[in-house]
């Protein structure tokens, strides 16, 4: 919306270089664009038109004449607002939102995320509390997350998408928050509320592909435009979607500007970039003969590499204090290395290897875990090759994979004990944490995108509510202690911030390690993944610590454990302390 020559109206622009003609149509002209032909801006491929009297709330699309003379009607790729699906029109909108998160924004870039606590609660917005709007969520979600001590939320889905079952991973409106939950200003209200509660906001961002809907980006002006012309490179084999043409400068600009837009316009603190591996490899999920190599005969996609580098460098330059996080499932070198050192430039990377191995370990019966001991220790071989997030995400608790507590062996008590011990190990392990909703209170059912978390498990009327509240209390205490202990986050990317104490006790199912803060202050984490109590278990400790005090014990009665705790300080003798290790539990100790 703008004023031109003293007249209020809306200026429409669209990139359609292959079009023979473009017209604006909408409810203001009964969807007949004959009266609103757009003019070409020459070799740029952009068409534009100022329409007087068109303002907030007007529905519109572009009527495009293809090179062959046929017509197609398309939504605006850069629309700031869209209709509620299944309707597909774009909506003229102008924000009037007045932000109240100035204190958060001013402090956002004060300390590098790698040297700060970073604990993420992953939220599927439509199902966290089904039926709530952005503004209604703002009345509940910030308080809940802040109470549990998470530093950030990661929200999905955010950008507009036609198929709800895609969970937002098949985007058509890259610049529009999904209208299912409200307007763009309503979404800003939610972000604002989270910031005012002291919670950072990450969003899932999907520049890897887009759906084939005939009103959206696919063959937008009658020719491949946002997608490569080579059909083998264009078609994404896993999802039936189309990949972006990262070698085309206009497409790169569309995506880079989009990343900046979310962080500047909506105060988003970070982007978790989905499916990075599928962008980096030309042969991703393709058989021999189904892909074409790059100009050097290789399988990597240099255009995608250049795009990711440009996106990260531009975002960090334009919006200091934001973080980008790669969901990258291969061993690509330099995902979190700086772009000036020829890395991709991400701030963090999901540690899919740690997730796969550690979940594999805890799913075994304790008697068999000794044969899989390396699955819990191998992560430290490469822990400092990238800057990692340890993700227990939505992908791990759906499609037959079971909820986290249900992955664990044994009876209900043992499953909960395993769950608690695992989270204690995870929060102490080098790397940042991410936990999907519902796992913080050990719901036993898989995540349902329709029904969301099973909140009734926490109700007074439910006979086992205490079991689930105990797990939630543990997550709260894990986050509280984590944020208070610099040893657990200050040197996450520094190998000298970690040392094994016991890494080879496969027969015992025991792991013990030290974490060190920048000033050298240690924290000792000990995990016993056996149902057997270990009496007088010897652990070597630094000589300069006169006594150790239990800071957290996942076996405490308040969490639902057997309450085998040690309230008194433990003094070392000859460089060792002797502990009684509770069954299926993790214990943290700090200098007394």
Swiss-Prot record:
The keyword Transferase applies. Belongs to the glycosyl hydrolase 13 family. GlgB subfamily. The gene is glgB2. It holds the Pfam family Alpha-amylase. Keywords: Carbohydrate metabolism, Glycogen biosynthesis, Glycogen metabolism, Glycosyltransferase, Transferase. It comes from Streptomyces avermitilis (strain ATCC 31267 / DSM 46492 / JCM 5070 / NBRC 14893 / NCIMB 12804 / NRRL 8165 / MA-4680). Monomer. This is 1,4-alpha-glucan branching enzyme GlgB 2. The keyword ATP-binding does not apply. Coiled coil: none annotated. GO terms for molecular function: 1,4-alpha-glucan branching enzyme activity; cation binding; hydrolase activity, hydrolyzing O-glycosyl compounds. GO terms for biological process: glycogen biosynthetic process. One of its GO terms (cellular component) is cytosol.
């Amino acid at each position: 919306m703008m004023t031109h020559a003293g007249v209020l109206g809306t200026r429409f622009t669209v990139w359609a270089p292959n079009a023979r003609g473009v017209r604006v149509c909408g409810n203001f002209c009964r969807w007949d664009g004959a009266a609103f032909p757009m003019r070409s801006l020459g070799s740029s491929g952009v068409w534009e038109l100022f329409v007087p009297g068109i303002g907030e709330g007007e529905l519109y699309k572009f009527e495009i004449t293809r090179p062959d003379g046929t017509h197609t009607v398309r939504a605006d790729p850069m629309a700031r607002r869209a209709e509620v699906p299944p309707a597909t029109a774009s909506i003229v909108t102008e924000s009037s939102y007045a932000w109240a998160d100035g204190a958060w924004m001013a402090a956002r870039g004060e300390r590098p995320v790698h040297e700060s606590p970073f604990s993420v609660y992953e939220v599927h917005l439509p199902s966290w509390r089904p039926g709530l709007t952005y503004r209604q969520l703002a009345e509940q979600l910030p308080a809940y997350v802040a109470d549990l001590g998470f530093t950030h939320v990661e929200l999905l889905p955010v950008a507009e998408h036609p198929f709800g079952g895609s969970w937002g991973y098949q985007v058509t409106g890259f610049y529009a928050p999904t209208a299912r939950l409200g307007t763009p200003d309503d979404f800003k209200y939610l972000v604002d509320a989270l910031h005012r509660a002291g919670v950072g906001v990450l969003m899932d961002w999907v520049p890897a592909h887009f759906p084939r809907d005939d009103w959206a980006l696919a063959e937008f002006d009658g020719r491949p435009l946002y997608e490569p012309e080579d059909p083998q490179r264009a078609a994404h084999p896993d999802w039936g979607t189309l990949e972006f043409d990262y070698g085309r400068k206009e497409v790169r600009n569309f995506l880079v500007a989009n990343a900046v837009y979310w962080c500047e316009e909506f105060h988003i603190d970070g982007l978790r970039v989905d499916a990075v591996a599928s962008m980096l490899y030309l042969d991703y999920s393709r058989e021999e003969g189904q892909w074409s190599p790059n100009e050097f005969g290789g399988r990597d996609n240099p255009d995608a590499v250049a795009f990711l580098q440009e996106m990260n460098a531009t975002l960090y330059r334009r919006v200091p204090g934001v973080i980008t996080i790669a969901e990258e499932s291969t061993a690509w070198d330099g995902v979190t290395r700086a772009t000036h050192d020829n890395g991709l430039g991400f701030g963090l990377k999901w540690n899919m290897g740690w997730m796969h191995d550690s979940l594999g370990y805890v799913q075994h019966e304790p008697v068999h875990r000794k044969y899989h001991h390396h699955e819990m220790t191998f992560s430290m071989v490469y822990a400092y090759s990238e800057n990692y997030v340890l993700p227990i995400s939505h992908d791990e608790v759906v499609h037959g994979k079971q909820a986290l507590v249900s992955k664990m062996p044994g009876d209900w008590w043992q499953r909960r004990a395993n769950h608690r011990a695992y989270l204690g190990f995870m929060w102490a392990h080098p790397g940042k944490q991410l936990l999907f909703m519902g796992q913080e209170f050990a719901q036993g059912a898989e995540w349902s995108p329709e029904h969301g978390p099973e909140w009734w498990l926490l109700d007074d009327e439910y006979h086992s509510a205490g079991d689930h509240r105990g797990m939630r209390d543990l997550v709260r205490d894990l986050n509280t202690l984590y944020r208070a202990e610099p040893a657990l986050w200050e040197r996450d990317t520094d190998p000298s911030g970690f040392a094994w104490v016991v890494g080879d006790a496969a027969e015992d199912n025991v792991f013990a390690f030290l974490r060190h803060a920048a000033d050298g202050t240690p924290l000792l984490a000990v995990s016993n993944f056996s149902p057997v109590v270990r009496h007088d278990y010897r652990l070597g400790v630094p000589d300069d610590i006169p006594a150790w005090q239990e800071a957290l014990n996942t076996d405490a009665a308040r969490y639902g454990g057997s309450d085998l705790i040690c309230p008194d300080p433990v003094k070392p003798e000859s460089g060792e302390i002797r502990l009684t290790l509770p069954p299926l539990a993790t214990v943290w100790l700090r200098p007394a």
